């Protein structure tokens, strides 16, 4: 991924850094929400789910070599570099939006009710004949998956083809603010989806 320091990240997510200040100039090598994927140099984002709280895995990921972690909890309980935020999920989106804007890359955003994935695959296939393309993989098309896809972008990529799925009011605006698409493709919308677009 393109260079991004903990200082950049702290500012992007409006957080407060806790730990050795010399770490602020260090660059992360990736971002993970899954403790099993938190490799050396990564920033860990501990999300809270219905049954699992990612904060419980912070000691594990730091042992694996992660550079720092976000946290919603009392940072004084941690001995590792951390960025305290109100919401790790929102911080994930804010950091992704910041990262996307650091890249000189064209983004094609695709949304709709039916046909998003096939349209994404077709567009990515055509563009890849000329450009280095990154596309959304699997179902990584929501407020968590989209940021993770964006973090996979490098300076070698020329185009990103990003699928954006929406299921609640305001989500389209939220996803667009993260991806900042240069080109928008809207495929078929059903009457059930229309109320969620705004």
PLM regions and their residue ranges:
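N-terminal leader/targeting and accessory segments in enzymes
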Residues: 1-94
């Amino acid at each position: 991924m393109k260079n991004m320091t903990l200082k950049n990240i702290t500012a992007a997510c409006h957080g407060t850094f806790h730990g050795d200040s010399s770490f602020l100039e260090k660059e992360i090598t990736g971002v993970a929400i899954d403790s099993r994927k938190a490799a050396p140099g990564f920033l860990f984002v501990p999300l809270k789910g219905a049954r699992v709280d990612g904060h419980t895995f912070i000691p594990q990921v730091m042992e694996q070599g992660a550079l720092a972690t976000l946290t919603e909890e009392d940072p004084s309980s941690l001995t590792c570099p951390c960025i305290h935020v109100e919401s790790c999920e929102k911080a994930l989106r804010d950091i992704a939006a910041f990262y996307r804007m650091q890249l000189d890359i064209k983004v094609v955003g695709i949304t709709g009710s039916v046909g998003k994935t096939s349209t994404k695959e077709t567009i990515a296939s055509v563009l890849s004949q000329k450009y280095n393309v990154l596309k959304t993989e699997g179902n990584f098309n929501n407020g968590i998956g989209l940021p993770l896809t964006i973090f996979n972008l490098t300076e070698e990529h020329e185009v990103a083809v990003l699928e954006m799925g929406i299921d609640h009011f305001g989500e389209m605006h939220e996803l667009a603010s993260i991806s900042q698409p240069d080109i928008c493709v809207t495929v078929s919308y059903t009457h059930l989806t229309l109320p969620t677009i705004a």
